[in-house]
Amino acid sequence: MRLLLSVLLLLVASLGLVSAVPAGSSITPPPPIEPIQLLSSRSTDSRRPWIRLRDRVIESIWGISKDSSHHRSVKDSPRSRSPSRSLTRYGSDVVLRFHLRNAEEAEALAEATDVLFLDVWASTSEFVDIRLAQEVIPSLLGLLPDSLRTAYTPLIDNLAEMIYATYPTRRPVGFEDHPGFIPSVRQSTQFGDLFFRDYQPLSVIVPWMRLMASMFSSHVQMINVGVSYEGREIPALRLGTRGQTAEPYPRKTIVVVGGSHAREWISTSTVIYTAYSLITRYGKSHEVTRLLEDFDWVFVPTLNPDGYVYTWESDRLWRKNRQPTSLHFCPGIDLDRAWEFQWDGERTRSNPCSENYAGTEPFEGMEAHQLAQWALNETQTNNAKIVGFLDLHSYSQQILYPFSFSCSSVPPTLESLEELGMGLAKVIRLTTHEIYDVTSACEGTITADDQARNRNSPPKKPIFPTGGSSGGSALDWFYHQLHTDYAYQIKLRDRGSYGFLLPSEYIVPTGKEIFNVVLTFGKFLVGDLAHNINLDWDAELQRTEPEEAPASQGDEPAPATQQVLQADVEDEETEWVEKARSEFRRR
């Protein structure tokens, strides 16, 4: 009788698992939206309710006593401290880096990832990063040639913990002792620093944007560039001092977009940081003031608000938008593959379960279509000419210029694109000593050094087509359809140590890199006109000081209140001195 009752309980507890899909598969049916359960004093038992009920009944029927030491080890495990949803979804997931040696290996790996619907995080000429569940690793290796079965290294083996670390929450006592988490000594001191100390959800970003437009109404306007599939507005900040009277020539406009892919949080934070830096320096810096007088700057923090919200509420690593497809359990369209120019989704990305699914026709991705319509309206009816386009993504630290759809088509302004691209990479190197490779988007898997050595050779085919070039990109559409003179896709930090889960202490350093990119971009566009005015562009560049770098684990931070007050005074004195020096140089 006991045995029969136990079997029945096991069957009941297993009903919810009948339709389960392995954690490494991209066709996992999305769970219902509910707030993330962050750490608290509640129980850390990660077992599902039915599992806990089953275990208790079996323990009482068979008289099994609880092993206190076992439960203590689970409670003390760093993995058990992750949010319950992250642990359930990604508890067994890892990120592997495969080292490629030839095109045959790349082709075999690409085919295997397509067959298993794996999530390719990044691809270069030397390696490919892939996320998958541990139980899927044998299946993947079985599809690969012998040379690749040992040619990989674990890149991330604590994915759930790293996901948890990206959320803005107070870490529990003892969690900072884990080697994967390094606290920062320098506390945030100003309003802007406090805002950029953590990643922010859309429910915080939108009111912040309204606040900026209200506080700085002379040169900031909050607009919407469209509406998402789920009905959310796609907010943007327009910076500039366009006069009330009609201008004789179209107003030159630069568009900066982030968050096309929902999980790339650093792109959204970087767009906001760059906008904030320009907003607060207007009227104080001759250089920034000149940029806002000569151009309109439109900053779109997240083109994919539905997907961004979903990464906060359900799945941190969601990439696409939330639009339904022909397969109800595989929603979403890749917004950077959905644009009309050279769209090739029917030929290369026709599977709705693919992370790169481009839809059934051009502009089926609603948010991409909305941005395109807004841009066309700006140029046709709002007396604007979009002269610059910066599309921020992550990760791999690359500055990419057109074309993305093919390496056989050479952009007519190639030399200018390369010249400015190299200048942008140089200013980043001067800012934080980080190296960004510069190449065409179709050769995104070929490093700048390779390109320099083979500049006179025919264009190369990307070694890993799954993560390489493609048609239907926003980059190509703005450059070709709108005749945007300078269009770039910038893949932000890092090179793989954290991937899409870049810790929040790198928000400000990455933001400084792109703020300096924007200054250099504007300086380049101003061109010869700037020679008539004494502008010191270098004085405005933001640099990351040594004390702003993440601290080592042995550092002892000062008490929070004392440190903040002291830092406030130091920052104000430094700002005043720098302004005085700048004014002295101008005179």
Swiss-Prot record:
This is Inactive metallocarboxypeptidase ecm14. The gene is ecm14. Gene3D superfamilies: Metallocarboxypeptidase-like, Zn peptidases. GO terms for cellular component: extracellular region; vacuole. Its main location: other. The lineage of its organism: Eukaryota, Fungi, Dikarya, Ascomycota, Pezizomycotina. SMART domains: Zn_pept. Residues 198-525 form the Peptidase M14 domain. Pfam families: Peptidase_M14 (PF00246). Glycans are attached at N377. Binds 1 zinc ion per subunit. Belongs to the peptidase M14 family. Residues 68-87, 542-573 are annotated as: Disordered. Disulfide bonds join C330-C353.
